[in-house]
Amino acid sequence: MTDRLKGKTAIISGGATGMGGAASRLFAAEGAHVAIIDRNGNAAAETVRSIRDAGGEADHWTADVSEEDAVNAAVAGVEARYGAVNVLFNHAGTIVIKPFLETTVEEWDWLHAVNVRSMFLMTKAVLPKMIASGGGSIVCTSSISAVAATPMEVLYDTTKGAVHMFARAIAVEFRDRNIRCNAVCPGFIRTPHGLREVAELQALGVDVSDAAIAAQQGRIGEPEDVARAALYLASDESSFVNGAHLFVDNGFTAI
């Protein structure tokens, strides 16, 4: 590894498993003090143990990142331990897959809370000290679903469209205070979340077979593919990249 985040404090929401877990391990290997904020405390603790066993530095805070008090308490805990946050990876998210006319207001509100409000809360909590310490990098997990609609995913697609613009708007407002904010936009990825999405879509008659995915993006992506893209956006290697959407989809959205 090349110490691209050496000495930096990095919060990763949803950093216990899947793409978030891969990012937690990679960021730590690149020298960051990794703070995982995740509602799955057991999984977060296991990821922290694996990072420490590999010689990295990490800790975790158990919190529902859609709840303001929980977010503020977790961020305060991170700052008390490590100081100002230099990197924020807003990764926590989930999905609702069902025919639109069967969805409910409760599902709409819940999904927006997890996928969008969480980024608002995390970013708002981290920014004051990040700015005061000289700036930093924020990365938000969007999706190909922000620009490529999928049947049965109206609620999910809408949240990712919001994330797309959230990242860009934060970049524009805070650029002159040395804050960068970009979005990483995965295609179909081999995680529990991604494989559940594929299974549920297939059960509803949407063609996301191996052949269909191969035609759209060559192969199914791996969590590490997304983690490496997030690392680039988090690190100083992307110091002149701000308000961008980096698609990790092997050309899915280019076709």
Model-derived regions, located:
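Short, small/polar-rich loop/turn modules that mediate ligand/substrate recognition or access, typified
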Residues: F89, R175, R180, V241-G243
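Active-site loop immediately N-terminal to the catalytic Tyr-X3-Lys motif
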Residues: K98-L101, A148-V154, D176-R177, G218, ...
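Substrate-binding pocket helix/loop in short-chain dehydrogenase/reductase
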Residues: P99-F100, E107-D109, A211
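C-terminal substrate-recognition "lid" of short-chain dehydrogenase/reductases
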Residues: F120, G135, R219-V248, T253
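Active-site helix of classical SDR
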Residues: T123, T159, A167
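Alpha-helical segment proximal to the catalytic Tyr-Lys
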Residues: P128, V172-D176, S239
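Residue(s) in the substrate-gating loop at a strand-loop-helix junction
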Residues: S143
